[in-house]
């Protein structure tokens, strides 16, 4: 099997795990008796832990040697599998909250390593098409979401840990299948010239884009984590949730599979700015939607919002960073996903409990607008 095919399996397995974890966190924890505010606190707290963990793992991978991306990913995948086994044993509520939060932390920590693998193979002269592999990830996400939506509607949220267990086992298998020649350890050279300056000074546009990305993803996380409540406000249920998530994932496919061509025509920074504007339009659409059909229609905009963001953010880090900072750059961009989850889930849970769905969507729209403006500013730097 070619490296390209194996990498597609890796992305597919990862996004199935992401779907079972992040896609159905609210469905599962609501079924376990948690409030929206408590769910926000759990996801935010462990998101903070993930935000600390991601850059540290990125620096370890950047050093090369034995602690490359694959050994680190194997450890995280094995821990995730063990976590899923414990969840299936139906522990007490408090322990369940901690275990599921830890699972989300591990899933977030895996992302920069999964993305960095494609550039590792390219550096060794093995062509890997990141866009098509990420498209396979979206396709797997869509299929699992449809299946889980139907299962949770019939059997309840308690089925989610079993889905997590199956996805974690598959992902661990796919990590094991990946060939990996360890990169030579990089010598610790004394930085010279502008290398002595801080990250913010060396990469000002990148740092502004990190802020923009965090706000875009705060919007994205609010409208995903609390999508079951958004649908419930217009008469929907968990079966509609499965359809909505799957529709959004399917809408990602044209962009994911065609991104290599798109990237040849536009810079990654420009594409992130376009994604920001699409998040704004999507937010307005959510606010105007008065039915399940309206929410489903808004999901079509996933093609121009998150789909563009997911691919362009990986390329943006690759384009913006010097060679010795590339995996760290990937980790920083992945941190915006975690930081967006912390901000969106924490604020979203509190606003939803206190003010309801309408105000929640207005707050989310404000975040999207601010993120789009910052992305435009970053492009001017």
State the predicted function of each range.
Residues 12, 93-111, 214, 294-308:
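Hydrophobic core of transmembrane alpha-helices in multi-pass small-molecule transporters
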């Amino acid at each position: 099997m070619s490296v390209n095919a194996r990498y597609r399996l890796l992305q597919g397995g990862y996004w199935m795990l992401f779907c079972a974890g992040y896609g159905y966190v609210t469905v599962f924890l609501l079924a376990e008796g948690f409030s929206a505010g408590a769910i926000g606190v759990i996801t935010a707290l462990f998101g903070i832990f993930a935000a600390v963990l991601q850059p540290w793992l990125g620096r370890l991978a950047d050093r090369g040697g034995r602690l490359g991306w694959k050994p680190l990913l194997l450890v995280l995948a094995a821990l995730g599998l063990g976590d899923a086994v414990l969840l299936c044993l139906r522990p007490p509520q408090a322990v369940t909250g901690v275990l599921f939060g830890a699972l989300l932390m591990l899933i977030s920590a895996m992302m920069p390593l999964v993305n960095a693998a494609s550039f590792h193979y390219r550096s060794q002269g093995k062509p890997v098409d990141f866009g098509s592999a990420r498209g396979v990830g979206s396709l797997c996400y869509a299929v699992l979401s449809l299946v889980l939506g139907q299962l949770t509607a019939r059997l309840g949220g308690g089925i989610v840990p079993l889905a997590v267990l199956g996805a974690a086992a598959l992902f661990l298998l796919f990590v094991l299948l990946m060939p990996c020649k360890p990169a030579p350890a990089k010598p610790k050279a004394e930085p010279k010239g502008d290398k002595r300056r801080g990250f913010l000074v060396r990469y000002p546009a990148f740092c502004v884009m990190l802020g923009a990305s965090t706000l875009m993803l705060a919007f994205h996380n609010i409208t995903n984590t609390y999508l079951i409540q958004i649908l419930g406000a217009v008469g929907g249920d968990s079966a509609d949730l499965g359809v909505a998530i799957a529709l959004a994932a399917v809408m990602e496919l044209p962009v994911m599979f065609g991104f290599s061509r798109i990237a040849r025509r536009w810079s990654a920074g420009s594409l992130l700015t376009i994604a920001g504007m699409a998040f704004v339009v999507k937010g307005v659409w959510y606010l105007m939607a008065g039915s399940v059909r309206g929410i489903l229609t808004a999901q079509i905009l996933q093609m121009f919002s998150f789909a563009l963001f997911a691919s362009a953010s990986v390329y943006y880090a690759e384009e913006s960073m010097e060679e010795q900072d590339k995996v760290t750059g990937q980790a920083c961009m992945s941190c915006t996903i975690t930081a967006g989850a912390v901000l969106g889930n924490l604020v979203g849970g509190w606003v939803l409990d206190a003010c309801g769905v309408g105000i929640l969507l207005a707050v989310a729209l404000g975040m999207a607008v601010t993120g789009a403006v910052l992305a435009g500013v970053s492009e001017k730097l």
